[in-house]
């Protein structure tokens, strides 16, 4: 079973016969398909692994992955976006600008519904092997600080303004509507309804609790690739 989406400036009467000819003529077996849980779950608890590899340019690459359960809701999706953007700004200030130890710390978030509701937060950066432990400590400390105190008013307002502007700009983008149609039919959630109201309502306390709830679940993976000791 397939769902086809058409987004953009399409003349319906012109498109109908083409859809009937090229899609309507496809064979069907009347089978309802669904996802398959391959049981490849992210490991629980705290896990750290550091290994060395010869490199032409000696570099340490550090990856943190935090995982846990969280309901698949529009508000949680928005909170995750707030959290990653705040962390991006904090790490730019505390790691890149103050320490000068990396070009940047990248934060990625993913809220999943299938095969089970799950929240992922990944933090990645590269640095001089001699600075890896110090910078990794700062990264963890700033994440814990966000979970304990929430973001500053300045960071909160910057993210809020950006998200509202991006939302307004997205109304004109076909790709945005394509993704939202997919979310609606696949996940059963309208990612546009009430979006601006939720963004405007987000507080520092909301973000603090969201990050704290993730860290309290105690699932942290830290993997470091560095160079052999000479």
Segments (PLM) and residue ranges:
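Generic recognition of flexible, low-complexity loop/linker segments
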Residues: 50-52, 93-94, 108-111, 195-196, ...
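Short helix/loop capping segments that flank catalytic or ligand/cofactor-binding pockets
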Residues: 14-15, 27, 72-75
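Bilobed periplasmic-binding protein/Venus flytrap-like ligand-binding cleft at the lobe interface
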Residues: 23, 80-89, 138-146
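Glycine-centered hinge/linker elements that transmit conformational signals in sensory
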Residues: 18-32
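A generic structural motif
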Residues: 29-43, 107, 153-160
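PAPS/PAP-binding and catalytic site of the sulfotransferase fold
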Residues: 4, 15-22, 139-140
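M16 family metallopeptidases and their MPP-like homologs
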Residues: 1-7, 58-75, 96-201, 219-228
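His/Glu-based metal-binding/catalytic segments typifying zinc-dependent metallopeptidases
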Residues: 31-90
